[in-house]
């Protein structure tokens, strides 16, 4: 009797395990920010997109393919040529995501690794097309315009593959060694020219200052000569007295004691 009970329990447990396995294989989860495409072994890829949550499928007949529909970044480096045939190294940062409603078409025509297959190809195509419209110098001075044109053209091109580009930006822009050296040489030449112009302007200012000073000295000498011709020795004696007065004032303010001989003027040869 006991053996039959244990046998019944064993069969029930086995049936329960099989049923649990079947139920478990018939369930699948779609996480937040993801979508699922169903592949049917008899009918192929279903033209439906499954949203977030837990869902049922037919075990061994249907298979879910999960896609991440959140925005993801990708850097794409490209080497191309400018309008004046300069080599340009550009790195483009792209923030992309698939159009959820087009996931069945994306999976059928491109595959799960759609970003690896599509983004490098169309980025190279668009960058070569846009950069070829600008000279190397314009790529630097008009970088915002270049970035905007690349973004517009690339967004339109990606839409044909069912991709949305939330952001496109130029993160790296360098040129070949020859162009870089030429730019550095030009900057050095401009600095030398500015320095030479400053030296010339300084010399001109010094020359003008010297001319003004000489004219002032000449005018002063002329005025003194006229005064001497008019006043004679009286003007000279007046200037001596003014100088003596100034010297005496300075000596009176000094802490040192100065002794003067009686009856003589040692400051200036003034008349007695």
From Swiss-Prot:
Q: Which residues form a coiled coil?
A: 177-211
The highest taxon in the source lineage is Eukaryota
Q: Indicate where the modification N6-acetyllysine is found in the sequence.
A: 128, 186, 202
Query: Residues bearing Phosphotyrosine?
Result: 249
Entry-linked InterPro entries = Band_7 (IPR001107), Band_7/SPFH_dom_sf (IPR036013), Prohibitin (IPR000163)
- One GO process term, biological-process aspect: positive regulation of ERK1 and ERK2 cascade
Q: Which residues carry this modification: N6-succinyllysine?
A: 202
Question: Which keywords does this chain's UniProt record carry?
Answer: Acetylation, Cell membrane, Coiled coil, Cytoplasm, DNA synthesis, Host-virus interaction, Membrane, Mitochondrion, Mitochondrion inner membrane, Nucleus, Phosphoprotein, Proto-oncogene
GO MF terms, alphabetically ordered: complement component C3a binding; complement component C3b binding; enzyme binding; histone deacetylase binding; protein heterodimerization activity; proteinase activated receptor binding; transcription corepressor activity
Q: What induces it?
A: Expression increases approximately 3-fold upon entry into G1 phase compared with other phases of the cell cycle. Also induced following inhibition of mitochondrial protein synthesis by thiamphenicol.
Which residues are annotated with the PTM N-acetylalanine?
2
Q: In which tissues is it expressed?
A: Widely expressed in different tissues.
Phosphothreonine modification sites are 91
A GO CC term assigned to this protein in UniProt: cytoplasm
Instruction: Name where it's found.
Output: Mitochondrion inner membrane; Nucleus; Cytoplasm; Cell membrane
Q: Report the main location listed first in the record.
A: mitochondrion
Q: Which Pfam families match?
A: Band_7 (PF01145)
Task: Outline the subunit composition.
Answer: The mitochondrial prohibitin complex consists of two subunits (PHB1 and PHB2), assembled into a membrane-associated ring-shaped supercomplex of approximately 1 mDa. Interacts with STOML2. Interacts with MAP1LC3B (membrane-bound form LC3-II); the interaction requires PHB2 and takes place upon Parkin-mediated mitochondrial damage. Interacts with STAT3 (unphosphorylated or phosphorylated at 'Ser-727'). Interacts with CLPB. Interacts with CD86 (via cytoplasmic domain); the interactions increases after priming with CD40. (Microbial infection) Interacts with SARS coronavirus/SARS-CoV nsp2 protein.
* Similarity annotation: Belongs to the prohibitin family.
Role this protein plays: Protein with pleiotropic attributes mediated in a cell-compartment- and tissue-specific manner, which include the plasma membrane-associated cell signaling functions, mitochondrial chaperone, and transcriptional co-regulator of transcription factors in the nucleus. Plays a role in adipose tissue and glucose homeostasis in a sex-specific manner. Contributes to pulmonary vascular remodeling by accelerating proliferation of pulmonary arterial smooth muscle cells.
Can you say what this protein is called?
Prohibitin 1
What taxonomic lineage is listed for the species of origin? Answer: Eukaryota, Metazoa, Chordata, Craniata, Vertebrata
């Amino acid at each position: 009797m006991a053996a039959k009970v244990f046998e019944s329990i064993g069969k029930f447990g086995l049936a329960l395990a099989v049923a649990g396995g079947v139920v478990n294989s018939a369930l699948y989860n779609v996480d937040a920010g993801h979508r699922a495409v169903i592949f049917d072994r008899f009918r192929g890829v279903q033209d439906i997109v499954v949203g977030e949550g837990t869902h049922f499928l037919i075990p061994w007949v249907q298979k879910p393919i999960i896609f991440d529909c959140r925005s993801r970044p990708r850097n794409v480096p490209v080497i191309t040529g400018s309008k004046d045939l300069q080599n340009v190294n550009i790195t483009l940062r792209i923030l992309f995501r698939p159009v959820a409603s087009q996931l069945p078409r994306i999976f059928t025509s491109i595959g799960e690794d759609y970003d690896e297959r599509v983004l490098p190809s169309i980025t190279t195509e668009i960058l070569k097309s846009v950069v070829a419209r600008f000279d190397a110098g314009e790529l630097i001075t008009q970088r915002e315009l270049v970035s905007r044109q690349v973004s517009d053209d690339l967004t339109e091109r990606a839409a044909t593959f069912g991709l949305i580009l939330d952001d496109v930006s130029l993160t790296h822009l360098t040129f070949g060694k020859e162009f870089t050296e030429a730019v550095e040489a030009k900057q050095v030449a401009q600095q030398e020219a500015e320095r030479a112009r400053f030296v010339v302007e300084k010399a001109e200012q010094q020359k003008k200052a010297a001319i003004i000073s000489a004219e002032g000295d000449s005018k002063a000498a002329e005025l003194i000569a006229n005064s001497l011709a008019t006043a004679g020795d009286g003007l000279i004696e007046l200037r001596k007295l003014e100088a003596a007065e100034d010297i005496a004032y300075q000596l009176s303010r000094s802490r040192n004691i100065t002794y003067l001989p009686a009856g003589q003027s040692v400051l200036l040869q003034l008349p007695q």
